[in-house]
Amino acid sequence: MTESIVTPKENPLAVAPVGGLIRRFALPAIVSMLVNTIYNITDQIFIGHTVGILGNAATNTAFPVVILSTGLAQLVGIGTAANFNLSMGAKARDAARSYVGTGLIMSAAFGILLGCLIYMFQMPVLLLCGATENVLPYAQRYLGITACGLPFLLFFTANSMLIRADGAPSYAMRCMVSGAVLNILLDALFMLGFGWGMEGAALATVMAQIVSFLVCIRYFFRFQAFPIVRTMLRMRGREMLRIAKLGLSNFLNQIIMMTVGITLNNILTHYGAASVYGADIPLAVAGIVTKLNSVLIAFTVGLAQGCQPIFSFNMGAGNYGRIKETYRKGLVFALLLSMAIFLVFQLFPRQITAIFGGGSELYFDFAEKYLRIYLMMVCISGVQPLTVNYFTAIGSVRTGLMLSLSRQGLFLLPLLILLPHIFGLDGALYAGPIAEVLAFILAMSTMYRHWQQLTRMERGK
């Protein structure tokens, strides 16, 4: 069993080699993030092969709901995990207990509320997300079922972060993997075997999410830092605010990402309708590229989340040199991961698109063009999430929030609105790489200034 967090001297976060710690915590976090994307990618692949382009477009219009769920999970999960680690690093065990109990109840309450709201208002939600007349019936059949799984999705996504913070990254990975494997098996059974189409994909997703939820719940009966007792499980106003404070930057980033997705869908259908591709092909391709980009996000954000306990604990313990070493090595890993994925996207765009089903030559032409242009600068995209998570983990909420919102809100969203008016459909594609470069410059310049401050703190210790 992994050693529980007790004191800085005893805890491996304070004394173990940094490179090994990053690998130990980041690998399960990356796998967990990847598995979370598999819920959506698996459906997209099976739907593409059994339903076709309209089915792929339908999952794209439902995807902003998943982004919203992820945002709420990160608001609670990252905020709870960061406060838990900061409290344990400062030897404040009672405060850590309060954060854990509050975080568990918050994640359950938010999930139930979101699921009910989406189920009741699914038609206006889908129209807002860009569903065309052809796509809407498929999207309704899909979202009407997957809305019922949102409470389970939000709970296990949020609390897998707390499980990692408790020193059990492998178990957090198990929560995600168990559901993902079942999702793949049920997709094959329900769609290929029974021919249930969109409903089969949605049902497979919900059943898999329930399994991941049950595996996650099981862990809290043997929480390592301290026992979870019933009196801990209540919402406390002060703890809720502090959890929200440290999770806010990640949450708002997801909200902006959702807004960008909705804006992009509507721009693609509007300008696509006036092009040779029509409205439905760009909408379907955007769904595929969004899912592929989520693979990159899984690697980079998973790496950043894996570094978070090291950042938080050592800031609480005052180990500034160790914090700098963690960021340096995390940056190298982030750039290597981003470059590897960039090469795959640039070299094999058509082959990757074919994984998600067949289509006309126009469909594949647009998919190849979209992949190569929109994801042109993903080779540097790992820097921003690492830097955002760093500032969030050490409690610098304003800086983390500013950086978190920069790529999507400050740069990408305005570019998506402006460039298509000048360059048409191509303008929406080039907005992606331009925003990536601007966000990279902002993150590195901000970290450079903070690095000098860390050096002074290290020398004055």
Language-model region placement:
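Short alpha-helical transmembrane segments in multi-pass integral membrane proteins
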Residues: 1-26, 84-151, 193-248, 311-377, ...
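Small-residue-rich hydrophobic transmembrane alpha-helices
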Residues: 56-116, 153-172, 265, 283-349, ...
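Hydrophobic transmembrane alpha-helices of multi-pass small-molecule transporters
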Residues: 68-71, 183-187, 213-217, 295, ...
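Residue-level signal for short hydrophobic patches within transmembrane helices
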Residues: 19-38, 42, 65-72, 148, ...
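Transmembrane helical elements of multi-pass membrane transporters/channels
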Residues: 24-43, 145, 179, 208-212, ...
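Short runs within selected transmembrane alpha-helices of multi-pass transporters and secretion channels
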Residues: 77, 146-164, 172-180, 201-214, ...
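Helix-terminus/linker motif at the lipid-water interface of multi-pass membrane proteins
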Residues: 34, 38-56, 126-133, 189-196, ...
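Transmembrane alpha-helix boundary and packing residues in multipass membrane permease domains
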Residues: 29, 33, 45, 49, ...
